[in-house]
Design a protein with these regions (language model features):
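Short, charged surface segments at domain edges that flank catalytic/cofactor-binding sites
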Residues: 1-22, 29, 42-45, 79
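Glutamate identity and glutamate-enriched acidic tracts
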Residues: 11, 15, 19, 33, ...
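Cys/His-enriched microdomains
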Residues: 12, 32, 49, 53
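Short Cys/His-rich local motifs and their 1-3 flanking residues in nucleic-acid-associated proteins
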Residues: 19, 56, 60
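Short Cys/His-rich "knuckle" micro-motifs
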Residues: 24-27, 35, 65-67
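Active-site lining segments that contact anionic ligands and/or coordinate catalytic metals
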Residues: 29-32, 59
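Polybasic, low-complexity binding patches
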Residues: 38-53, 61-85
Length: 85
């Protein structure tokens, strides 16, 4: 599952701000949210090259921030670099 892969790839850190997950889940896992940089509802793929693990604040910013478009483009470049490694 793409979500599980992306959360594991993040190793407990937000892939945008690099801060540790803000808390752990009841199962002891770091809490991060999978963000589809190209939204699936807009035809974006469910592919690790287009999904990033974010803390809740960065996730909200990616959707509702005044700089959301630029932020998502930066995230896309970051994920492309990580997936090439």
């Amino acid at each position: 599952m793409v979500r599980d892969y992306v959360l594991a790839r993040a190793e407990g850190q937000c892939e945008h701000c690099n801060e540790p997950a803000p808390f752990t889940t009841p199962h002891g896992r770091p809490y991060l949210e999978a963000h589809h940089i190209r939204r699936m509802t807009d035809g974006g793929p469910d592919d690790p090259r287009f999904v990033i693990a974010l803390c809740p604040n960065c996730h909200r910013r990616a959707h509702f921030g005044h700089d959301a478009t630029e932020l998502n483009e930066d995230m896309l470049r970051h994920v492309a670099a990580v997936e090439r490694e």
